[in-house]
């Protein structure tokens, strides 16, 4: 394995919020995530709030591609989810956009606990702790030298997460009365 800086294998992208006082910026069709929406799920499929194209154009929100790993950077540092379709976030994120061919989305998602510990360690702030994009970009990670190895490791954790999800649902399925 080799040591790499996160910023060398991914773009770290912050978010933004359109003015809440302008109704023409809201209730559109562009996904716009807030940290409270990121919990224990693996994938982020659709946000609770949506912004319009006008809201996007008039804010510092950035369009993130599918495969981006959303990373909460304040108020609960270190919650992650993988975007399944393009979307935006508010400023409570420093999202990880993997460079094609250099970083596998599920591999970096599988390192959530390491990302969280790092964010909590380097985060600063007097009102609430926050980790910046620059701080995230210099995070050192031990990485397999090839994308194929990352995908193999990421695939293993993906199967493991799938099994865990199935087992968590199993008691519910067995406790449902027959109709």
Describe the function of each predicted region.
Residues 28-29, 34-36, 43-113:
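A short beta-sheet element
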